[in-house]
UniProtKB/Swiss-Prot annotation:
One GO biological process term: hard palate development
Gene Ontology molecular functions: integrin binding; metal ion binding; molecular function activator activity
Residues annotated as binding Mg(2+): 140, 142, 144, 240
Cytoplasmic side: 730-787
Complex formation: Heterodimer of an alpha and a beta subunit. Interacts with FLNB. Interacts with HAX1. ITGAV:ITGB6 interacts with FBN1. ITGAV:ITGB6 interacts with TGFB1.
Lineage, uppermost ranks: Eukaryota, Metazoa, Chordata, Craniata, Vertebrata
Disulfide partners: 23-41, 31-454, 34-59, 44-70, 197-204, 252-293, 394-406, 426-452, 456-476, 467-479, 481-490, 492-519, 502-517, 511-522, 524-537, 539-560, 544-558, 552-563, 565-574, 576-599, 583-597, 591-602, 604-614, 617-620, 624-669, 630-649, 633-645, 677-701
Record's comment describing the protein's domains: The VWFA domain (or beta I domain) contains three cation-binding sites: the ligand-associated metal ion-binding site (LIMBS or SyMBS), the metal ion-dependent adhesion site (MIDAS), and the adjacent MIDAS site (ADMIDAS). This domain is also part of the ligand-binding site.
Family that this chain belongs to: Belongs to the integrin beta chain family.
Residue ranges constituting the I-EGF domain according to the UniProt record: 456-491, 492-538, 539-575, 576-615
Protein name (record): Integrin beta-6
Length: 787
């Protein structure tokens, strides 16, 4: 009994409540089909578990099958599982023998997955201390790299000295490249074929593709000696054949000397871009690169003029396959190009190379430290039909979902990764996956298989008597009928039964398209929404109208598409109560006499009426004129009279508010004020039925008299009248004077005066005669006398 309870707990543990009902209505008729429905579905193989309804009810969640009466031993529910085959502990500290180093755990496991299910496993990676390093120096020997060649003549000794601080097991090798020795990549005159630099003039080696010069060795002086002997070469175009050289350096494992248990570093040094892919078609080379080693007995690339340049994808495959980490050491002009390449190549880094390679030692050391500070997982193998997701748990203890890389790690730190794997379909074959850290040889091998078969499928009763006289095979509790027979127990012959009896009327689908016709009788399908029933499966209990998302308003039952309301409810949705208790106001009047009782709720007719029984109606009666005193006080009040206005407003049962409100339910009002202004405002009611006054304003007010203008007008009028009167007086005086003058002149003209001399008048001159004057002429002498 205890074992059964444990098994039951494990069955229930994998239950998914959200999709629990998906099994029962899936229509699965075999155990395999049921398992494909979802990872939460199980099959009951118990005999006589179902009746005429057939095999559909056998597929359900484990707990539902138990509730239906299926015994636990007959429940087929294979679960996803992980079986670890090898799990050596991670290495700690320095290891004397490199073959004993373990940097990933576990190393091998078997993963069995239910389709749609997910299994999570944990992978741990720890980079061990003092790990062996193999470094291959691959140099561009085109003419522009002449000064760089002089700089690295002592590089071997200096590099070995610096690397000895990081590892006690270091080896280095050397190789060089230029370009494919074929037109149009090289000069083709006889003299320039022998010496491509003859036009300078300068002697340099003939153009070559790739030369492997020094296998990996721990003799640094041997490296220096080899470098001193090197000569430059030349080609025509700017891009070089560097990718040809990278491919050969990666795949020629034995000739280069790559060890199995070491870190493989390939340092690529150049000041130019590299040809790749179909660039070689310019030279008539059309055979794709095969990714194989083609070094001849002189350690030169023998297929340089035959095979195309490798593509980026081919380089990635071979670098990953041989655990080679690429370090691009390139000049400033080429950095952006090789950064794009490095983004595609796992584990690749880019360093800025000085014009004469003066910083190459620091560049290599920095790149090595960067590579050792990162742990990144990569997946190799056939992943079609699989879903893999990673969650990284780095040394800082923080989870990074959807990430399979940890940075800023120290050597000896452990990086953990949760790897979730799921399979989408059933397949008979097993597949092999490899998960490994980029650049390391340690791997986790995973054998993945789909768990789609039921144990009961191994027991088949052919032509079983349980299937109506042997008309079928009995397997997993159901009959698989032989050709020509049908029915849950193969009791019907296809030639004996017509589906017409399962049609409601000619032209209609059999069993209304919602069931199967077995022996002239409809067996309705299961539905996640409810029951399908009727002689033709034409009815159900879930297709009725809904109210607020509830079938028949939750106040009735759905029967064949129509709501059958319970007592006290009516309406098409059963959403209308027949009770009027909620419509009666406190005085017993229905809806306070201001509305109608509809479906147990008051629908108020009067504008402004509200409340459950229309008891609130601030706008009923004369709502505008009754608030006159409040409104006029508000418009004329200053700060000191504010309290007085509040009292007046309260007396009218209203308050004034400047807050926002809905105008849809407001009542507009207008009053004539004492100052003959038109006062407008809006009245609303709050949730408690209190009257709120909004938007008080005055308009169409008569304008007040302009006193200064009136005074100015009066003054101007008085002045004008004075001037006019003065002018009139002047005219009258002038007229009178003229009249008097005329009269005087007339009288003077009528006067008759006598002509004579005034006896009192004496003239002003006197005449005397000089008797003594002797001349003949008469002289008049005028003497003037005052006396």
């Amino acid at each position: 009994m205890g074992i059964e309870l444990v098994c039951l707990f494990l069955l229930l543990l994998g239950r998914n409540d959200h999709v629990q009902g998906g099994c029962a209505w899936s229509g699965a008729e075999t155990c395999s089909d049921c398992l494909l429905t979802g990872p939460h579905c199980a099959w009951c193989s118990q005999e006589n578990f179902t009746h005429l309804s057939g095999a559909g009810e056998r597929c359900d969640t484990p707990e539902n099958l138990l509730a239906k009466g299926c015994q636990l031993p007959f429940i087929e529910n294979p679960v996803s599982q992980v079986e670890i085959l090898q799990n050596k502990p991670l290495s700690v500290g320095r290891q004397k023998n490199s073959s004993d180093i373990v940097q990933i755990a576990p190393q091998s496991l078997v993963l069995k997955l239910r389709p749609g299910g997910e299994q999570t496993l944990q992978v741990q990676v720890r980079q061990t201390e003092d790990y062996p390093v193999d470094l291959y120096y691959l140099m561009d020997l085109s003419a522009s790299m002449d000064d760089d060649l002089n700089t690295i003549k002592e590089l071997g000794s200096r590099l070995a000295k610096e690397m000895s601080k990081l590892t006690s097991n270091f080896r280095l090798g050397f190789g060089s490249f230029v370009e494919k020795p074929v037109s149009p990549f090289m000069k083709t005159t006889p003299e320039e074929i022998t010496n491509p630099c003859s036009s300078i003039p300068y002697f340099c080696l003939p153009t070559f593709g790739f030369k492997h010069i020094l296998p990996l060795t721990d003799d640094a002086e041997r490296f220096n000696e080899i470098v001193r002997k090197q000569k430059i070469s030349a080609n025509i175009d700017t891009p070089e054949g560097g990718f040809d050289a990278i491919m050969q350096a990666a795949v020629c494992k034995e000739k280069i000397g790559w060890r199995n248990d070491s870190l493989h570093l390939l340092v690529f040094v150049s000041d130019a871009d590299s040809h790749f892919g179909m660039d070689s078609k310019l030279a008539g080379i059309v055979i794709p690169n095969d990714g194989l080693c083609h070094l001849d007995n002189r350690n030169e690339y023998s297929m340089s003029t035959v095979l195309e340049y490798p593509t980026i994808g081919q380089l990635i495959d071979k670098l990953v396959q041989n655990n080679v980490l690429l370090i691009f050491a390139v000049t400033q002009e080429q950095v952006h190009l090789y950064e794009n390449y490095a983004k595609l190549i796992p584990g690749a880094t880019v360093g800025l190379l000085q014009k004469d390679s003066g910083n190459i030692l620091q560049l290599i050391i920095s790149a090595y430290e960067e590579l050792r500070s990162e742990v990144e997982l990569e997946v190799l193998g056939d992943t079609e039909g699989l879903n893999l997701s990673f969650t990284a748990l780095c040394s800082n203890g923080i989870l990074f979902p959807h990430q399979k890389k940890c940075s800023h790690m120290k050597v000896g730190d452990t990086a953990s990764f949760n790897v979730s794997v799921s399979i989408t379909n059933c397949e008979k074959r097993s597949r092999k996956l490899i998960i490994k850290p980029v650049g390391l040889g340690d791997t986790l091998e995973i054998l993945v298989s789909a768990e789609c078969d039921c144990d009961c499928q191994r027991e088949v009763e052919a032509n079983s008597s349980k299937c109506h006289h042997g008309n079928g095979s009995f397997q997993c509790g159901v009959c698989a009928c032989n050709p020509g027979h049908m029915g849950p127990r193969c009791e019907c012959g296809e030639d004996m039964v017509s589906t017409d009896s399962c049609k409601e009327s000619p032209g209609h689908p059999s069993c209304s398209g919602r069931g199967d016709c077995y022996c002239g009788q409809c067996v309705c399908h299961l539905s996640p929404y409810g029951s399908i029933y009727g002689p033709y499966c034409q009815c159900d209990n879930f297709s009725c109208l809904r109210h607020k998302g509830l079938l028949c308003g939750d106040n009735g039952d759905c029967d064949c598409g129509e709501c059958v309301c319970r007592d006290g409810w009516t309406g098409e949705y059963c959403n209308c109560t027949t009770s009027r208790d909620a419509c009666a106001s406190e005085d017993g009047v229905l809806c306070s006499g201001r509305g109608d009782c509809v479906c147990g709720k008051c629908v108020c007719r009067n504008p402004g009426a509200s409340g459950p029984t229309c008891e609130r109606c601030p706008t009923c009666g004369d709502p505008c004129n009754s608030r006159r005193s409040c409104i006029e006080c508000y418009l004329s009040a200053d700060g000191q009279a504010q309290e007085e206005c509040e009292d007046k407003c309260k007396a009218t049962g209203a308050t004034i508010s400047e807050e926002e409100f809905s105008k849809d339910t407001s009542v507009p009002c207008s009053l004539q004020g004492e100052n003959e202004c038109l006062i407008t405002f809006l009245i609303t009611a709050d949730n408690e039925g209190k009257t709120i006054i909004h938007n008080i304003s005055e308009k169409d007010c008569p304008k007040p008299p302009n006193i200064p203008m009136i005074m100015l007008g009066v003054s101007l009028a008085i002045l004008l009248i004075g001037v006019v009167l003065l002018c009139i007086w002047k005219l009258l005086v002038s007229f009178h004077d003229r009249k008097e003058v005329a009269k005087f002149e007339a009288e003077r003209s009528k006067a008759k005066w006598q002509t004579g001399t005034n006896p009192l008048y004496r003239g002003s001159t006197s005449t005397f005669k000089n008797v003594t004057y002797k001349h003949r002429e008469k002289h008049k002498v005028g003497l003037s006398s005052d006396g």
